[in-house]
Amino acid sequence: MISTSDFRTGLTVEIDNDVYQIIEFQHVKPGKGAAFVRTKMRNMRTGAVIERTFNPNEKLAPARIERQEVQYLYNDGESYNMMNMETYDQFTVSKADMGDAIKWLKENMTLTIASFNGNIIAVDLPNTVELAVVETAPGIKGDTASGGGKPATLETGAVINVPFFVNIGDVLQVDTRTGNYVKRV
């Protein structure tokens, strides 16, 4: 059991058969009355953020999250086929379970899947991926004077904003957490 005094940002706890990750927490000691811990937590399944207050003597169960390193093999239209890097077992992951990770998936990419009670709750991608530009407007001389950028479609179908000097065929490094252009590779 985890005491509220042991709360840390990023800690995962189980509340009502759901997994929550602590985003923020604050120990509050009012001048009058008992102390308490105010938290902001994200539901790992739904992504919803809730605020909850706990008594200082309250104890919570730690969430037993299993993480496995997998390799993305291919998409068969309805689901995404993965291979466990330790056991080499192949399995499928539904489009809903993949979430926003679909935008950055490239065949043979290594990623981490987190599961709770056998259900996938999170797909963790590398912080950056390298993807080729398949469609963008050509850069015109003098465009850079105004700054800004232009939209570009990547090989996975994701559309991001890139600087004017980027052309079709360029390989870019993209931050998967924010969806921002990092640099040309």
Curated annotation (Swiss-Prot):
Keywords: Cytoplasm, Elongation factor, Protein biosynthesis. SUPFAM superfamilies: Nucleic acid-binding proteins (SSF50249), Translation proteins SH3-like domain (SSF50104). It holds the Pfam family EFP. It is found in: Cytoplasm. InterPro entries: Elong-fact-P_C, NA-bd_OB-fold, Rib_uL2_dom2, Transl_elong_fac_P/YeiP, Transl_elong_KOW-like, Transl_elong_P/YeiP_cen, Transl_elong_P/YeiP_CS, Transl_elongation_fac_P. It comes from the Bacteria. One of its GO terms (molecular function) is translation elongation factor activity. Coiled coil: none annotated. One of its GO terms (cellular component) is cytoplasm. PROSITE patterns: EFP (PS01275). Pathway: Protein biosynthesis; polypeptide chain elongation. The keyword Cytoplasm applies. HAMAP family: EF_P (MF_00141). Belongs to the elongation factor P family. Involved in peptide bond synthesis. Stimulates efficient translation and peptide-bond synthesis on native or reconstituted 70S ribosomes in vitro. Probably functions indirectly by altering the affinity of the ribosome for aminoacyl-tRNA, thus increasing their reactivity as acceptors for peptidyl transferase. This is Elongation factor P. It comes from Desulforamulus reducens (strain ATCC BAA-1160 / DSM 100696 / MI-1) (Desulfotomaculum reducens). The lineage of its organism: Bacteria, Bacillati, Bacillota, Clostridia, Eubacteriales.
